[in-house]
């Protein structure tokens, strides 16, 4: 394995299986951006088309989710979130595998993700946080690909420039109308601002809320 030194003298591998080529940190302001923003898919609503469906499973089928894709979630529900676990349970029953899980963060309530890693449903994680027991198990090497951890701002940048492409974003919205307009201000599970999910809603190929 070949290595390059970063700005603080630490040797960083040139390439990691499951991630690809690595660019070492060269120092503050050392690299000027040359990329363009990724283009979001253009969408149109056919007259009288209904966006509401009867179940999460039906929504997943309509999204076209398949093996090898990337799915995302936000973490505004903090340790009370059940959406990640419920969605992965449904995806598992549908037989979909080899997914990259790209949430804004994962909390202690997401321990059930461990079983989906072991069964091959989830093979990669890109997040801004991992906590026990999930983090402990991943540290033991149960995940097929190396985890990518970014700051919250770094995650938004990665989605905007296409480094992290989201195929289907699952947005836990306390309130949402049939046109897809949503907010966190009202509803039984009102959580306040949903800033972490904005970039997902803007750039994901499909949004399920």
Regions found by a protein language model. Give the residues of each.
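Conserved alpha/beta enzyme-core scaffold
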Residues: 1-209
